[in-house]
């Protein structure tokens, strides 16, 4: 397996940015879409619970409908080649006895993981469904980070979107999937202009070495 050298890794980390406008003429190939979907599917999660569902929107009319309920992100979404809707599972679906959890793992893995997960729910969350919901959202955002970095490795661009009306977008999607619980949107495509220079805190302010 070949890995990127130090300079290439540094370049990619610096070039990744939140793209605010995409090349509206750029269309993803089926290979690119499949690769993005696989990047999402292979995202890590605590206990390998994978408490998410990803909806890839490439239909222009549907994307336009969603964009209309995204406030100041409307033009950016319309210019994107695709829009990923990141949805979370319900807390009840992550209970150890749920159909989802009982069918998620191979039997040899399940007998080890389910008891440990059940113990964690009691010790860490005191069986609070609200805390379990927060845990699920944490896992979804881990996936979001992987997706955006993975897309950058493909030479493509992305923007995480929290500014939208989840009820309105949910109503649009309900015609196709059952009652989605939307965490965020990710606009995907090819940048139309070069990114501005990345601005970050200094290493001294951001990192403590012990």
Curated annotation (Swiss-Prot):
GO MF annotations in UniProt: oxidoreductase activity
Positions bound to NADP(+): 150-155
InterPro entries hit by this protein: NfsB-like (IPR033878), Nitroreductase (IPR029479), Nitroreductase-like (IPR000415)
EC number of the protein: 1.-.-.-
Keyword RNA-binding: no
Pfam families named among the record's database cross-references: Nitroreductase
Keyword annotations from UniProtKB, A to Z: NADP, Oxidoreductase
Enzyme class: oxidoreductase
Transmembrane stretches, start-end: none
Domain of life: Bacteria
Family statement: Belongs to the nitroreductase family.
Matching PANTHER family: NAD(P)H NITROREDUCTASE YDGI-RELATED, NADH DEHYDROGENASE_NAD(P)H NITROREDUCTASE XCC3605-RELATED
Described function: Reduction of a variety of nitroaromatic compounds using NADPH as source of reducing equivalents; two electrons are transferred.
Record's protein name: Oxygen-insensitive NADPH nitroreductase
Organism of derivation: Helicobacter pylori (strain J99 / ATCC 700824)
């Amino acid at each position: 397996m070949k890995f990127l050298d130090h300079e290439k890794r540094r370049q990619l980390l610096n070039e990744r940015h939140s793209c605010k406008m995409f090349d509206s003429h750029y269309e993803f190939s089926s290979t690119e879409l499949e690769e993005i979907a696989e990047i999402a599917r292979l995202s890590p999660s605590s206990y390998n619970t994978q408490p998410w569902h990803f909806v890839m929107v490439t239909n222009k009319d549907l994307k336009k409908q969603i964009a209309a309920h995204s406030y100041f992100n409307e033009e950016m979404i319309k210019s994107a080649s695709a829009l990923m809707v990141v949805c979370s599972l319900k807390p009840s679906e992550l209970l150890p006895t749920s159909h989802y959890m009982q069918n998620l793992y191979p039997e040899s893995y399940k007998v080890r993981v389910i008891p440990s997960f059940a113990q964690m729910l009691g010790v860490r969350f005191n069986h609070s469904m609200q805390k379990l919901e927060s845990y699920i959202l944490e896992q979804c955002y881990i996936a979001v980070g992987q997706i955006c970095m993975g897309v950058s490795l493909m030479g493509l661009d992305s923007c995480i979107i929290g500014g939208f009306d989840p009820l309105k977008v949910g109503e649009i999607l309900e015609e196709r999937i059952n009652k989605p619980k939307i965490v965020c949107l990710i606009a995907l495509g090819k940048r139309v202009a070069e990114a501005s220079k990345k601005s970050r805190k200094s290493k001294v302010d951001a990192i403590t070495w012990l």
